[in-house]
Amino acid sequence: LNDVEIEDGTVRIIYDENGAERRFEKINANLSLPHLVDPLTAKGDFDWKNTRVGFDLKLSTPADLESRSARIELALDTEAIDAKFDGNVMSKPAFSVEGDLTAKSQSVPSLIAWMRKEPPTEAAVGSGELSSHIAWQPGEITFTQARFALTHASGQGQAVVTLKSPRPHLRAA
């Protein structure tokens, strides 16, 4: 797969036997993976929740995912947020990610509305930035060395988000 071009593609991820799914549509991308032991690079854009998302991905060696972690660099660019992640990803024994995240949004309320599928809201929060070391394991995301800045507030600390239904639980200090 030296040079692959995807035009107007769709990816459906089906989560369970009930057919719960997530769709990524209108995918336009260029990717390269000469061999499974070579780096995977992919760059392009797609639609998610009616918003164009640009991406740039580098994965050190996909073959490593069979038995150990692989290095990953991912940048996402939307109207709602610009984010970069640099770290490691594992697929076994369970999916996990650990590394450094930086993100910047011109409108935190619009970002939250986009993530939750709700119409944009007006609020005084305004823009925001976040940087943190994160560890994402099944059922939990841990933020350490976290720093955030909003229009009228800033802070630092750590947090753990427990991903349980019906709502996630946040503990922070």
Task: Kindly give the residue locations of the regions a language model identified.
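Beta-strand-rich interaction surfaces with strong enrichment in secreted/lumenal proteins
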Residues: 74, 119-121, 133, 145
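Repeat-solenoid scaffold signature
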Residues: 136-172
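Extended non-catalytic domains of envelope/secretory-pathway proteins
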Residues: 112-113, 122-128, 132-134
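Extracellular loop and loop/strand-boundary signature of outer-membrane beta-barrel proteins
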Residues: 29, 116-120
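Elongated, acidic membrane-bridging lipid-handling scaffolds
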Residues: 1-97
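Residues on the solvent-exposed faces and adjacent turns
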Residues: 8, 15, 33, 103-107, ...
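Membrane-embedded beta-strands that build the outer-membrane beta-barrel scaffold
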Residues: 42-44, 57, 85, 99-101, ...
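Short beta-strands and strand-coil junctions in structured, solvent-facing domains, enriched
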Residues: 11-14, 82, 108, 154-156, ...
